[in-house]
C-alpha cells in the first residue's frame, strides 16, 4: 500500500491542481485538516524549499490570503519568451477548446470550465492568459471567490473579429455533430473543435 503523502506534499499538489486561481487559506485548512499555524509553517517550509532549490523554477506566493504556485522571477525571461515569441503558432486543441468556452460563456471560472471539459484546464488557461487572449475580470461571489475569465480585445484582433457578435452562433451547429469551427482556419491556422454548450 502506498504511504500517505506528507502534508507539505499535499499542499504542493493542491496548489498545482488549483492553477492560476490558487487556494484561499480557509479552503486549504479544510482540505489539509490542519490548524492555521500549521498551514503557515508548511507554507513557509515549502516556500523556502522551492527558493533554495536551484533546479526548481517555481515559487510559492500568498496574496490576499490566497496561496499560489507560480514561476519564479529568475525564470521570467524564458517564460516570457516561450509565451510571447510566436503568437501565430497554432494553439493546442485544449487551448482552443477553453478559448471557445470562455468566448461563449464569459465571465466564467476555471472550475466551471473544468466541469464542461471534464479535465483540469489550469495549464492551457495560463497559456491563454500569458498570450493575452484572455484575462481575469473580477471574482465570482461564491465560496473561495474564484477568478472570472473573459476574452480580451487582443482575442478579437488575433482571430480577426470586430466583436464577439461575429462568433459563429452555436445553434447553427446543433442540428448535427459537426465540430464547431470558431476561428478562421486559413488565416489563423486554428483547428476545428467540438464545443458542447451544455444545458
Swiss-Prot record:
Q: Which UniProt keywords apply?
A: Cell cycle, Cell division, Chromosome partition, Cytoplasm
Keyword Cytoplasm among UniProt keywords:
yes
- Quote the subcellular location field of this record: Cytoplasm
Q: Name the lineage.
A: Bacteria, Bacillati, Bacillota, Bacilli, Lactobacillales
The biological process GO terms on file are:
cell division; chromosome separation; DNA replication
Where is it predominantly found? cytoplasm
Q: Which Pfam families match?
A: SMC_ScpB (PF04079)
- Sorted alphabetically, which NCBIfam families does this protein's record hold? SMC-Scp complex subunit ScpB
Q: Which gene encodes it?
A: scpB
Q: Which family does it belong to?
A: Belongs to the ScpB family.
Quaternary context: Homodimer. Homodimerization may be required to stabilize the binding of ScpA to the Smc head domains. Component of a cohesin-like complex composed of ScpA, ScpB and the Smc homodimer, in which ScpA and ScpB bind to the head domain of Smc. The presence of the three proteins is required for the association of the complex with DNA.
The free-text function statement in the UniProt record for this protein reads:
Participates in chromosomal partition during cell division. May act via the formation of a condensin-like complex containing Smc and ScpA that pull DNA away from mid-cell into both cell halves.
Q: What is the protein name given in its UniProt record?
A: Segregation and condensation protein B
From what superkingdom does this record's organism come? Bacteria
Naturally occurring in which organism (per UniProt): Lactobacillus gasseri (strain ATCC 33323 / DSM 20243 / BCRC 14619 / CIP 102991 / JCM 1131 / KCTC 3163 / NCIMB 11718 / NCTC 13722 / AM63)
One Gene Ontology cellular component? cytoplasm
Amino acid at each position: 500500500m502506498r504511504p500517505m503523502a506528507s502534508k507539505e506534499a499535499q499542499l504542493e499538489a493542491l496548489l498545482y491542481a488549483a492553477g492560476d486561481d490558487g487556494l484561499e487559506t480557509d479552503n486549504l485548512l479544510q482540505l489539509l485538516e490542519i490548524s492555521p499555524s500549521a498551514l503557515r509553517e508548511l507554507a513557509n517550509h515549502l516556500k523556502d524549499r522551492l527558493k533554495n532549490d536551484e533546479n526548481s523554477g517555481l515559487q510559492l506566493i500568498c496574496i490576499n490570503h490566497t496561496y499560489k504556485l507560480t514561476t519564479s522571477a529568475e525564470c521570467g525571461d524564458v517564460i516570457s519568451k516561450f509565451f510571447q515569441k510566436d503568437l501565430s503558432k497554432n494553439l493546442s486543441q485544449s487551448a482552443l477548446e477553453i478559448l471557445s468556452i470562455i468566448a461563449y460563456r464569459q465571465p466564467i471560472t476555471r472550475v466551471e470550465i473544468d466541469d464542461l471539459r471534464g479535465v483540469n484546464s489550469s495549464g492551457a488557461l495560463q497559456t491563454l492568459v500569458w498570450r493575452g487572449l484572455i484575462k481575469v475580470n473580477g471574482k465570482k461571489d461564491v465560496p473561495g471567490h474564484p477568478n472570472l475569465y473573459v476574452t480580451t480585445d487582443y482575442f478579437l484582433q488575433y482571430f480577426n473579429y470586430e466583436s464577439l457578435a461575429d462568433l459563429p452562433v452555436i445553434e447553427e451547429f446543433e442540428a448535427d455533430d459537426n465540430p464547431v469551427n470558431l476561428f478562421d482556419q486559413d488565416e489563423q491556422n486554428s483547428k476545428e473543435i467540438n464545443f458542447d454548450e451544455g444545458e
